[in-house]
Amino acid sequence: MADQLTEEQIAEFKEAFSLFDKDGDGSITTKELGTVMRSLGQNPTEAELQDMINEVDADGNGTIDFPEFLNLMARKMKDTDSEEELKEAFKVFDKDQNGYISAADWRHVMTNLGEKLTDEEVDEMIREADVDGDGQVNYEEFVKMMMAK
């Protein structure tokens, strides 16, 4: 995961890590995490801090080291990127920008992509993604469908 980061991103994250790692020992404790979060106006409980550490503490030593921190940041970035990409993709399909992808919208985009689909195939694709059964695909349904791929 972290191997997909640029050198610039790694340098930025190293700086951020140093802000958390108050005593400079190369690891972030729950106490250090709490200090930083409180300085940002958050008020996490000790249990919440422990949960946050445990979530990324790959070696189970109770603290976050830099490689673990990098993995966390890379995961968060990937989530953000894919959400933006999904919004853009949805806009491409939602021709009339009404918040829904109709069979006509779907057919139009697929044809432009060079996909020769029959009306039945288009209807079937819409049906598969159309969770609430209203005959069109809203953003939530689109995200579910894309994430399932």
Curated annotation (Swiss-Prot):
Residues given in the record as Ca(2+) 1 binding sites: 21, 23, 25, 27, 32
Transmembrane segments: none
Modified residues (N6,N6,N6-trimethyllysine): 116
Keywords: Acetylation, Calcium, Metal-binding, Methylation, Repeat
Lineage of producing organism: Eukaryota, Viridiplantae, Streptophyta, Zygnematophyceae, Zygnematophycidae
Binding site for Ca(2+) 4: 130, 132, 134, 136, 141
CDD domains in the record: EFh
Domain called EF-hand: residue spans: 8-43, 44-79, 81-116, 117-149
Disulfide bonds: none
Domain of life: Eukaryota
Organism whose genome encodes this protein: Mougeotia scalaris (Green alga)
Function: Calmodulin mediates the control of a large number of enzymes, ion channels and other proteins by Ca(2+). Among the enzymes to be stimulated by the calmodulin-Ca(2+) complex are a number of protein kinases and phosphatases.
SMART domains in UniProt: EFh
Pfam families named in the record: EF-hand_7
GO MF term set: calcium ion binding
Name the UniProt record assigns to this protein: Calmodulin
Further details from the record: This protein has four functional calcium-binding sites.
